[in-house]
Amino acid sequence: MKPFAMLFLAAVLYSGFVFPRPMQQTEADAERYIIECEGQWAASSASGDTTALQRFLADDFLGVDPDGSMYNKEGAISETKTGPKTFVSNHTNEVNVRFYGDTAVAQGSESWERRSGQPRYGRYVWTDTWVRRDGNWQIVAAEDVEVAEKAPTK
């Protein structure tokens, strides 16, 4: 009986190394990740880099632009990559994240400067809904509202 118990214990311990379980992410880690991703999304509208968007926008993502038009993941990536580069810069300001189990709601704002046109400076206030699927946080829904902002003082 003892050899069987030792063999069983060895098999259990070995399986933990061969088939590691996903690392449990703390809420603080998830919050940092979400805030970082929100910053990458804002920056991508000026840079055209869609690498981060491809990772954190869910395949079934659906967003609403300030003008009320709806867009999906494919549209967001296409517009960011090949659309006109409207913004010189775009960066997040504050981002607040609240968790509800495997769902998180991120609310924040970002400030931008256009290459041309009016208004030259502005701000988006937004709400993004994140869902944890298979251990990965992804945005499933987004809504943006455009608000006026004064030109920065230099």
Feature-to-residue mapping (PLM):
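Positively charged n-region of N-terminal signal peptides that target proteins for export
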Residues: 1-5
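Bacterial N-terminal signal peptides
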Residues: 6-16
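A beta-strand edge to alpha-helix "cap/lid" segment located at domain peripheries
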Residues: 17-154
